[in-house]
C-alpha cells in the first residue's frame, strides 16, 4: 500500500515573494479556497507578524477553510509566535512554522549569533510554540549550507523541544539530488525522538533542481513536500507542486507514494494563480503549459492518433485540461449560463449571477462563441472591478499631430468621486498612461507591458498585464476588455490602486 506524501502549499507566503506579485485580500481568500479544493494538506497562509494586512488575511483564511490545515510563519521571536496563534486559532487545524538561520554565513553576517545562541533560541522558541500548537514545524534556514554536525544538533534540539515536523530548506537552491537525499537519510539515522517526526523538503530552483531535489527527499524518507503552484517564488522560484503530484502519480511504480491532490483541479488551480499573480505560465511548462499535450511532429501526431500512449504518459483530462467543451452563445439563456458557472466551479449568489449574465450577454454580442476561458476572464474582470478602489469610467483618444496622441481618462473611486485628466504621448498607450499618472500625481516606471489573448480568434478578449514601479515599490495590474486600449487603461489604473492600498496598510514588526 502506498504511503501518503503531505503537500504543504506556500503560494500565499513564499510564492508572494515573487517580485511584483502582491495578492489582494480577496485574491488570497479565493486562492486558499481553490487550494483546499485541489486537495493540499497544509496552506502556509502568510507571515502574520509582518503586517496587519498579512495578519488579517491569515485570520480570514483560518476562519474559512474546513479541511485544510492553516499555517503561519514565525521567526524565533515570541511576538511572531503570538501573532501566528492569534491569527490561526479559529482554524479547524491551526499550525505554526518556526524558523531560524543556521548556516555559517547567516549566523555571522545576518544574525550575529554563535552556534550556542542559535541552539538556545531554537529550544526556547520551539518550546514556547508548543504551548499553543499541537503540531510545531521547525526549519533550519539555509540548511543545505549548514555544517552537517551542527545541522544534526539543531534538529535534535528542535525535536527535544517538541517539534514534530522538521523541514529542511534548500534556501538558495544550492543542493543537488544525491546530496539533498543524503541529508534526509543522515538526519533520520542520527536524530532520536520519543514521538513521531515528519521530515519535510523545501527547495528553491536557482539551479533548476527544485523538483528533482524534492523527489530525492521522498526517496530518502521525506513525507512532506513544500512548494508553490507553477513554481512561483523569489529569484528562480520554488518546487512546482503540480510536478511533484503528477510525478508521484505517473511513477507510482518507483516512488510507491501518493498525495491526496485532486488532479482534475490542477489546471484550474494553476490558471487562477497565474491570473492573480500576473505571471503567464510558460508554454512549455510541464503539466500545465499550453504545449504540455501538443504534438507538432507528423510522426508524433500519427502515433497519438493511433494510440495516445505512444507519446503521452498522462492524459489532458487527468489534470483538468478539456479537449472538448460546449461554448455558450448569444442565444444562451440564464439557465445555461448558471449551469456553466457551476460546471466551472463557481458558487455565485443569485444577485451576482444577474450582473454576470448581463456582462456575459455583452460579450456574447461581440463573439460568435463564448468559451470557458471567456467565462473565467469575465468573472475575474468583474471581481477586479467590484473590489477596485478606483475604476475606469471613460476613455477618449484622438490623434493630435506629428505622431502624437491625446488621451482623456476619467476614473471613479469607491466613494463615487470622479477624477479626470488628459495628456499627450508618442502613442495611444503612452498618452493614456501619462493621463493616469497625472490623476494619481505619481511618477512611474513601466517595467512590463504584456497583452494576452484570452482565447483564439480575431474576436478574442484582450488581457493586459502591467508591472510598474512607484517609489521603489513594484505593483501589478490586470485589465480585460475587447478593446486593447481600454484593457490597457484598466490594468494601469489597477496597478496604481494597488500602490495606494499598499501605502495605507500599517507596517508590522521588523527586527
Curated annotation (Swiss-Prot):
Family annotation (SMART domains): LeuA_dimer
Stretches for region Regulatory domain: 391-511
UniProt-annotated binding residues for Mn(2+): 14, 202, 204, 238
Classification via PROSITE patterns: PYR_CT
Span of domain Pyruvate carboxyltransferase: 5-267
InterPro entries cross-referenced by the UniProt entry: 2-IPM_HCS-like, 2-isopropylmalate_synth_dimer, Aldolase_TIM, LeuA/HCS_post-cat, LeuA_allosteric_dom_sf, LeuA_bact_synth, PYR_CT
Keyword annotations of the record: Amino-acid biosynthesis, Branched-chain amino acid biosynthesis, Cytoplasm, Leucine biosynthesis, Manganese, Metal-binding, Transferase
Essential cofactor(s): Mn(2+)
Pathway: Amino-acid biosynthesis; L-leucine biosynthesis; L-leucine from 3-methyl-2-oxobutanoate: step 1/4
GO cellular component terms, A-Z: cytoplasm
Main location: cytoplasm
Enzyme category, top tier: transferase
UniProt record, GO biological process: L-leucine biosynthetic process
Catalyzed chemical reaction(s): 3-methyl-2-oxobutanoate + acetyl-CoA + H2O = (2S)-2-isopropylmalate + CoA + H(+)
Places the protein is found: Cytoplasm
Entry superkingdom: Bacteria
EC numbers, comma separated: 2.3.3.13
Pfam families from the UniProt entry: HCS_D2 (PF22617), HMGL-like (PF00682), LeuA_dimer (PF08502)
The UniProt record lists the keyword Repeat: no
Gene Ontology molecular function: 2-isopropylmalate synthase activity; acetyl-CoA C-acetyltransferase activity; manganese ion binding
Biological function: Catalyzes the condensation of the acetyl group of acetyl-CoA with 3-methyl-2-oxobutanoate (2-ketoisovalerate) to form 3-carboxy-3-hydroxy-4-methylpentanoate (2-isopropylmalate).
NCBIfam families found in the cross-reference section: leuA_bact (TIGR00973), PRK00915.1-3 (NF002086), PRK00915.1-5 (NF002088)
Protein family per UniProt: Belongs to the alpha-IPM synthase/homocitrate synthase family. LeuA type 1 subfamily.
Subunit architecture: Homodimer.
Protein name: 2-isopropylmalate synthase
Species of origin: Staphylococcus saprophyticus subsp. saprophyticus (strain ATCC 15305 / DSM 20229 / NCIMB 8711 / NCTC 7292 / S-41)
Gene name of this polypeptide: leuA
Amino acid at each position: 500500500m502506498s504511503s501518503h506524501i503531505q503537500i504543504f502549499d506556500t503560494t500565499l507566503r513564499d510564492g508572494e515573494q515573487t517580485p511584483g506579485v502582491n495578492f489582494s485580500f480577496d485574491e488570497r481568500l479565493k486562492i486558499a479556497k481553490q487550494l483546499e479544493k485541489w486537495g493540499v494538506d497544509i496552506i502556509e497562509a502568510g507571515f502574520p507578524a509582518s503586517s496587519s494586512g498579512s495578519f488579517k488575511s491569515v485570520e480570514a483564511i483560518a476562519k474559512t477553510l474546513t479541511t485544510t490545515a492553516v499555517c503561519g510563519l514565525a521567526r524565533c521571536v515570541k511576538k511572531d509566535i503570538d501573532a501566528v496563534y492569534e491569527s490561526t486559532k479559529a482554524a479547524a487545524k491551526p499550525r505554526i512554522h518556526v524558523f531560524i538561520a543556521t548556516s555559517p554565513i547567516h549566523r555571522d553576517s545576518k544574525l550575529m549569533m554563535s552556534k550556542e545562541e542559535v541552539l538556545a533560541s531554537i529550544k526556547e522558541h520551539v518550546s514556547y510554540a508548543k504551548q499553543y500548537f499541537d503540531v510545531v514545524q521547525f526549519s533550519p534556514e539555509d540548511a543545505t549550507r549548514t555544517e552537517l554536525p551542527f545541522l544534526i544538533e539543531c534538529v535534535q534540539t528542535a525535536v527535544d523541544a517538541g517539534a514534530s515536523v522538521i523541514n529542511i530548506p534548500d534556501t538558495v537552491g544550492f543542493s543537488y539530488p544525491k546530496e539533498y537525499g543524503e541529508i534526509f537519510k543522515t538526519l533520520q539515522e542520527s536524530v532520536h525522538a520519543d514521538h513521531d517526526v515528519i521530515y519535510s523538503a523545501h527547495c528553491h530552483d536557482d539551479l533548476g533542481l527544485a523538483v528533482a531535489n524534492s523527489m530525492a527527499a521522498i526517496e530518502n524518507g521525506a513525507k512532506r513536500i513544500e512548494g508553490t503552484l507553477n513554481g512561483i517564488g523569489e529569484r528562480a522560484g520554488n518546487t512546482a507542486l503540480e510536478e511533484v503530484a503528477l510525478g508521484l502519480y505517473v511513477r507510482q511504480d518507483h516512488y510507491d507514494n501518493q498525495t491526496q491532490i485532486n488532479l482534475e483541479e490542477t489546471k484550474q488551480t494553476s490558471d487562477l494563480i497565474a491570473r492573480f499573480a500576473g505571471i503567464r505560465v510558460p508554454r512549455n511548462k510541464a503539466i500545465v503549459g499550453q504545449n504540455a499535450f501538443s504534438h507538432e511532429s507528423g510522426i508524433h501526431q500519427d502515433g497519438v492518433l493511433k494510440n495516445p500512449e505512444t507519446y503521452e504518459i498522462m492524459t489532458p483530462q487527468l489534470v483538468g485540461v478539456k479537449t472538448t467543451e460546449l461554448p455558450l452563445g448569444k442565444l444562451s439563456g440564464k439557465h445555461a449560463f448558471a449551469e456553466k458557472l457551476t460546471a466551472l466551479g463557481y458558487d455565485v449568489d443569485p444577485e451576482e449571477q444577474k450582473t454576470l449574465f448581463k456582462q456575459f450577454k455583452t460579450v456574447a454580442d461581440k463573439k460568435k462563441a463564448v468559451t470557458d476561458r471567456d467565462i473565467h476572464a469575465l468573472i475575474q474582470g468583474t471581481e477586479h472591478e467590484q473590489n477596485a478602489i478606483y475604476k475606469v469610467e471613460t476613455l477618449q483618444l484622438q490623434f493630435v499631430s506629428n505622431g502624437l496622441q491625446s488621451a482623456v481618462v476619467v476614473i471613479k473611486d469607491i466613494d463615487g468621486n470622479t477624477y479626470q485628466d488628459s495628456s499627450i504621448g508618442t502613442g495611444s498607450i503612452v498618452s493614456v498612461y501619462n493621463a493616469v499618472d497625472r490623476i494619481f500625481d505619481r511618477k512611474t516606471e513601466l517595467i512590463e507591458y504584456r497583452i494576452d489573448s484570452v482565447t483564439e480568434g480575431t474576436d478574442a478578449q484582450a488581457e493586459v498585464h502591467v508591472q510598474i514601479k512607484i517609489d521603489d515599490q513594484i505593483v501589478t495590474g490586470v485589465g480585460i476588455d475587447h478593446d486593447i486600449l481600454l484593457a490597457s487603461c484598466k490594468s494601469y489604473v489597477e496597478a496604481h490602486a494597488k500602490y495606494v492600498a499598499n501605502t495605507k496598510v500599517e507596517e508590522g514588526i521588523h527586527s
